[in-house]
Amino acid sequence: GFNSEELPLSVLEDILNGGINIAKKAGIPVLGGHTIKDKEPKYGMVVTGSVDPNHITRNDTAIEGDLLVLTKPLGTGIISTAIKQNKSNHDIMHEAINSMRELNKSAMEAMIDVGVNACTDITGYGLIGHLLEMCKGSKVSATIEFNSVPFMRGVFELAQNGIVPGGTKRNLEFAKKKVT
């Protein structure tokens, strides 16, 4: 989404060039796109590809005893919400932006090297939502040691002040019956 009435087109150009540069780093072509008018700038990409069926790693193939490895600290959703509400300081904002800009390529390469059984991303359903999905599909259970989970700086303070995405509240409502 882009609001050309409030933002100069040079901002849109910078956003698009940034996406193209990251796609080049990832070794993928950019083949098209679309833009919608929206008050709030939004940018995203969809990647389509093919994979050897013998090398697919899914989210429903975990095995009891597997370790859970997070490749980035949690908290971008909360910090993004704080940014939208003008309640994030400069350092915390840039830490979240830098995390979101970082490719997962090295994590993917490490995953292949060690031969993981399953993987998933942590997006809108949060750690608990995605872990519940993985456990249900794999017919396993999981234990999380809270103090071992990496979080971005400032996330707890923001959450304590009620700055959380709307989806977080829905995720909690969904998960509280399934998590002890």
Annotated model-derived regions:
Residues 46-56, 91-111:
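Active-site glycine-rich loop that binds ribose-phosphate moieties when present
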Residues 6-29, 36-41, 113-114, 119-180:
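Glycine-/charge-enriched secondary-structure boundary and capping motifs
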Residues 1-88, 151:
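Glycine-rich anion-binding loops of enzyme active sites
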Residues 25, 63, 106-114:
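Secondary-structure boundary elements
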Residues 34, 60, 71, 96, ...:
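Glycine- and other small-residue-rich loops at beta-strand/loop junctions that grip anionic moieties
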Residues 41-43, 47-48, 73-74, 100-104, ...:
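Long, contiguous hydrophobic alpha-helical segments, chiefly transmembrane helices and signal peptides
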Residues 80-85, 104-109, 129-131:
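Short amphipathic alpha-helical segments, especially helix-boundary/capping motifs
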Residues 2, 83-95, 160, 174-179:
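Active-site phosphate/oxyanion-binding loops
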